[in-house]
């Protein structure tokens, strides 16, 4: 179920403060965040945000096509290594 249109998109307050501070200074630096649930809003476009994936922070450059999506969608948490090879010893 999607979020109600009456409510605004969720963005963590500390992340919003960091972005507003960088926009007023007109500087570009990497913003580190653990807030994977935050929605990407238009003022974030052009910034690089390092999103935590459970192990490390992955730097993601925000473009205009990402607006409306969540930050966590761009930092995968699982590393699929493939299925086990057909091992006949395990089937006996």
Swiss-Prot record:
The lineage of its organism: Eukaryota, Viridiplantae, Streptophyta, Embryophyta, Tracheophyta. InterPro entries: Ribosomal_uS19 (IPR002222), Ribosomal_uS19_bac-type (IPR005732), Ribosomal_uS19_CS (IPR020934), Ribosomal_uS19_SF (IPR023575). Protein S19 forms a complex with S13 that binds strongly to the 16S ribosomal RNA. NCBIfam families: rpsS_bact (TIGR01050). It is found in: Plastid, Chloroplast. This is Small ribosomal subunit protein uS19c. GO terms for biological process: ribosomal small subunit assembly; translation. HAMAP family: Ribosomal_uS19. One of its GO terms (molecular function) is structural constituent of ribosome.
């Amino acid at each position: 179920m999607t979020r109600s249109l009456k409510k605004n998109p969720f963005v963590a307050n500390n992340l919003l403060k960091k972005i507003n501070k960088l926009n007023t200074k007109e500087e570009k630096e990497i913003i580190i965040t653990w807030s994977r649930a935050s929605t990407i809003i238009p003022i974030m476009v052009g910034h690089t945000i390092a999103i935590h994936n459970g192990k490390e922070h992955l730097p993601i450059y925000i473009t205009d096509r990402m607006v409306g999506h969540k930050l966590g969608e761009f930092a995968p948490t699982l590393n699929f290594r493939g299925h086990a090879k057909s091992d006949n010893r395990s089937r006996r």
